[in-house]
């Protein structure tokens, strides 16, 4: 079973995930979507950068990031699943994002953006989690996505 780890770059590794969120309700929403993803894959929320050799998806507002539709994200997730990926880290940057040198060193399998708008990093994390859950819903043809 695929393991998906949301890594919150602004949060200290090993600290309680709910403490990463100062916006009222953001931790609840993040936990809600992580739980929903957990119906399809093992899902965790962690602080700091990933420390494993798995695949990396980088949510980044920078130049070169792909703006994907929900269906395109679902297709990327399907490719990971079908390729036998066992661990997928979704890294969400902090308020300052990443330098091009840092992104280059990470070598992400997917560098994606939620669009040209600037969002608070906590909200971006929640939206990313919702979109990963929606991607699973698309792949499973679940009612969550139908009609949207």
For the regions a protein language model found, what residue spans apply to each?
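S-adenosyl-L-methionine/SAH cofactor-binding core of RNA-modifying enzymes
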Residues: 32-89, 95-100
